[in-house]
């Protein structure tokens, strides 16, 4: 089977493990984008700690789940958004105004939409979680 998007595979594994009530999930392969996306999720307390296991191949990530994720996904294609369009995308993708986060990649790094608004920058949409 050919992997189209490793980030999409990772987020699907997390959602499936959450629905089954698992406490941990093993995700492979590892990538910098996945690690940064998980750091945003951990900062917002949607997942617990995660550990990167180097197996001298593509790497693995062991993620501790805390039962807060209802849905997460990748936005493909990665649309360009300006600062003004972030709120439109948030209302389109998230269930309510103060629930959930959109993750974007900007020139300042990977961050959620609230941090992008405070830093006054736009970027490309990566995904969302709530």
Curated annotation (Swiss-Prot):
Disulfide bonds: none
Gene Ontology molecular function terms on file: structural constituent of ribosome
GO cellular component: cytosolic small ribosomal subunit; extracellular matrix
PROSITE patterns: RIBOSOMAL_S8
Gene3D superfamilies xrefs: 3.30.1370.30, 3.30.1490.10
Family assignment from sequence similarity: Belongs to the universal ribosomal protein uS8 family.
Descriptive protein name: Small ribosomal subunit protein uS8
Natural source organism: Dictyostelium discoideum
